[in-house]
Amino acid sequence: MSGFDAVLLVAVLLLALIVLGAVLVGVRAVRGIAGAPRPEDPAFIAEKDRQEQSLAALRSAADEANSTVDAAKSAAAAARTEAAAARAEAKAARAEARRVLDGARAEADTILERVHKQAEADAEQLRTAARRSGEREAAVLATTTREQAAEVERRAARMDDRERLHSEEVERLAERDRQLSAASAALAARESTLVDRDRELAQAEDRRRRELERVAGITAEAARGELVEAIEAQAKREAALLVREIESEARNTGEERARHIVVDAIQRVASEQTAESVVSVLHLPGDEMKGRIIGREGRNIRAFESVTGVNLIIDDTPEAVLLSCFDPVRREVGRLTLEKLVLDGRIHPHRIEEVHDLARQEVVQLCQRAAEDALVEVGITEIHPELVSLLGRLRYRTSYGQNVLKHLVETAHIAGIMAAELRLDVPTIKRCAFLHDIGKALTHEVEGSHAIVGADVARKYGESEDVVHAIEAHHNEVPPQTIEAVLTQASDACSGGRPGARRESLEAYVRRLERIEEIAAGKLGVERVFAMQAGREVRVMVRPEDVDDISASVLARDVAKQIEEELTYPGQIRVTVVRESRVTEIAR
C-alpha cells in the first residue's frame, strides 16, 4: 500500500466516525421527542424546534460527509488507476532494461572477442619484431666479436714488433756503452796529459810574471789595481754619456708625445663656450610694455630692482630691455621674473615679489636639471644626490668669466681623451676631472680653498681616494701622487688656458662687487645687499625693527667709509640704505 492510499483510508475512517456520531445524536433527539410533554408547553415547543434544527444540521453534515466520502472514493479509484498505470510502466521499463542489458551483454561479448583477436595479432607482431631484433643483435654481436678478434690480433702483432724493437734497442745500448767506455778511457788519458801541460804552463806563467815584475819594477797586484781603476773610470764615463743621451731622447720624445696628446684632445673637444656676459636681453612684445614695466613714477622698476638686485636698463632699443648684474644666478632669476611679469601682464610691486619667489624655485630646478644633463653628457653614473645638487649650483657660477659647470664638462672630455690615448682608466679619470671644482659651490659657506673643500665633500659622499686626491691636488695644495691627479691638472689647464675661455678683468670686477656686498652685509641689522649700476651704487635693505632712521644714516656712512679704506675703484660709489616698514591687517 502506498502513502497516498494510507492517507485516503484514514480520511474515510474519520468521515465514517463523524457520520456515526451524527446518527447517534439524531436517534437520541428522536427518543427525546417521543417521551416529551405535551405540545402545548412553550418550553417543549422551543426545545423541539431546537432539536429539529440540530437534526437538520446533522442531516446536512451527514450529506456533506457522504459527498466527501464519495469524493474520497473517486480519488481512491483514480489513485488505484494511476498506481496500476505506474505498475504497468514499471513492468515495461523492467522489460526494456532487461532487453538493453541483454544487448549490452551481447555487445560486450563481441568486443571481448574482437579485443582477444587484436591482442593475439599484437602478440604475434611483438613476437615477430622480437625475433627480428634478436637476429639483428646476434648479427651485430657477431660482427663486434670478429672486430674484437681482429683488434686482438693487431695488438699481438704490435707487441711482437715492440719486443723486436726493444731487443734491437738493447743491443744498440750495449754497443754504445762499449763505445762510451772506450771514449772514457781515452778522455782520462787525455785529461792526464792536459793536467801535465797545465802544470807546465802555470810554471812558465809564473816564471814570466816574475820576469815582468823584475823588469817593470811593480807587482802584479798593483798592476791589476791600476788596470781596474782605468777600466772603471772609462766605464763610468761611457755610462754617463749613455744615460744623458737616453734622458735627452726620452725628454724630447715625451714632450712631443704629450704635446700631441694635448693638441689632439683640444681639437677633438672643440668647445663653443667662451667668457660669460654680465648682461641679459629680454625681448618685449611691444614698446608700450616698457611704460608698464616702469610703472607710475617709476615704482615698478624700483620695486623690481629692490626685490631682485638686478639693474633694469630701459633705453631706446626697440622692443627690448637689458638686465645687468655680476651675479649670474641673480641675473637669471631677474630675467625669469620679468619674463613672467610681461607674459602675465599684471605688473605691480606685490606681484613682482610673488613672481620673484616662483622664479627662484624655477632656477633651482634648472640647476638640478643642468647637473643631470652634464652627468649624462660626460657619462658618469652612480653619484650621490648631494653632489648632483652641488654641481647644479655651478650652472650659474663663473671663474674668470668662464662658466664652471661647462668648464667641468669640457675638462672631463679632455681628460677622457688623454686617458684613452695613454690607455688608462677612462671612467675614473673623467670622474676626477668632472668633480675637481666641486668645492666652488661651497666657498661662500665653508672656509678654505675650493680644492680642499671639494676633496672633503667628495670623501664625505663616498668618492674613491683616487678621485679625492685628484681634487685636492689639482692646484698643488697637496703634491700630486697619482697619474689621475696629473691628468686632472693638465685637462684643467687646457680648458682654462685656451683662447677666449677666461677674462682676468671680468674676474677682478666680479670680486670687487662681491667684496662691496660682503662689507655691507657684515653690518648689524642688514637683511639684503645689492651692488647695482656696475658697482657704482650699493643698495642696503635693513630690518626696520633693528635699524631706525638715525641708525640708517650712520650705517650708510660706515659702509661708505669701509669701502673707501679697503677697495680701489674708479669714480664714486653711492651707498643707499633702504628702510621699509610694512603693516598688514586682515579685514574679516
Curated annotation (Swiss-Prot):
Gene3D superfamilies: Hypothetical protein af1432. Its main location: membrane. GO terms for cellular component: plasma membrane. InterPro entries: HD/PDEase_dom, HD_domain, HDIG_dom, KH_dom_type_1, KH_dom_type_1_sf, Ribonuclease_Y, RNase_Y_N. GO terms for molecular function: RNA binding; RNA endonuclease activity. The keyword Transmembrane applies. One of its GO terms (biological process) is mRNA catabolic process. Residues 404-497 form the HD domain. Residues 130-162 are annotated as: Disordered. Residues 278-359 form the KH domain. Endoribonuclease that initiates mRNA decay. This is Ribonuclease Y. It comes from Salinispora arenicola (strain CNS-205).
